[in-house]
Amino acid sequence: MSTRAYRGRSPEQRVAERRERLLAAGLDLWSELGWSGVSVRGVCARSGLTDRYFYESFDDRDALLLAVFDRVRDELTGRLLAVPFTGEPRAVMRAMFTTLITALADDPRHARIAFTEPAGSPALETRRHDALLAVAGAVAEGVSSVAPVPPGGVRGPALFCVGGVGGLISAWLAGRHPATPEELAESCTDLCARVFGV
């Protein structure tokens, strides 16, 4: 790779910019076609880059898909962790669910990536499972900071809530659970409050 600046940008900056274009194209295509509809050729066409630049940043299509998934996961988890874990437990839960549902409504592409099953892709299935555990950890941290810890700890109830909320949000996104975002956040809060006994 050249070490010269080009149009005022270093080689590293140009690589990073191309990677961002590829990630944006992958996000768009995945949200439109599902993960199995994403191809190296399609990503290159959408980003306006050649496959040479694709392979500069990613080993293969799966590496791109994992990077897109990680970006969505990190953004959603970051928003959840920004919710103040203080106050009445139900208020904390409601704030977390409102934050999550608002984020999904703000960028529906994230909803498809975060809440559709990646069946047929072992790498994506593993990553999605790991994300479920990470979000459950955030929920457990938030709830345990404002509510008594139930017998047996908070991990099991947190996993149960996150899985159930994921199913409810998936049904909502598919139009099978009619509700406003506010009603959905309230339903999620009610269900999880019962699980945690608060």
Over which residues does each language-model region extend?
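Generic hydrophobic, amphipathic alpha-helix propensity
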Residues: V15-G26, V43, V68-L76
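Helix-turn-helix
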Residues: R21, L29-A63, A67
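Secondary-structure edge/capping motif, primarily at the C-terminal ends of alpha-helices
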Residues: L80-P84, A114-P118, V146, W172-R176
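Amphipathic alpha-helical packing segments from all-alpha helical-bundle domains
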Residues: P122-A147, G152-G167, D190
